[in-house]
């Protein structure tokens, strides 16, 4: 059953059609009934008559407890929002002539970001005449990728953009 937003649902007295295809409480088909008879059946069961498919011919109405239905729907929406994870891109900036200790610190930070599930953009900024030695920058990026290959995959290979060379790493998805 496709869930429709409240503004599209018609309940009990809001329904303005002559006859409906009626679906019972347990989902069983009760056939095509006049609206008055369908409302009487819903009243006898002490529940609501909800028009769930107004475009169908004849429109489909279901006998259900609308309050409970609305609560379950909101609960499901809340669960879906909880399950959504926001992936952010963190940046680690390096230099083509980076010292070993500095490189290890940047590598440790990059690994922390990846372990938390974030993507990491590793960028190298070329200053002055360093731009003539792009291979040194590529070597630094390759070393960074090699040392994080156990927890990350290369999402975007090293490429130049102006005076910067960058690559993007993503955490390895969990294998379930």
Curated annotation (Swiss-Prot):
Biological process annotations from GO: ribosome disassembly
Keyword Cell division belongs to the record: no
Superkingdom in the source lineage: Bacteria
Molecular functions per Gene Ontology: ribosome binding; translation initiation factor activity
Location of the protein in the cell: Cytoplasm
Protein keywords: Cytoplasm, Initiation factor, Protein biosynthesis
A Pfam family assignment: IF3_C
Function: IF-3 binds to the 30S ribosomal subunit and shifts the equilibrium between 70S ribosomes and their 50S and 30S subunits in favor of the free subunits, thus enhancing the availability of 30S subunits on which protein synthesis initiation begins.
NCBIfam families reported for this sequence: infC
Subunit architecture: Monomer.
Protein name (database record): Translation initiation factor IF-3
Source organism of this protein record: Streptococcus thermophilus (strain ATCC BAA-491 / LMD-9)
Lineage of the organism: Bacteria, Bacillati, Bacillota, Bacilli, Lactobacillales
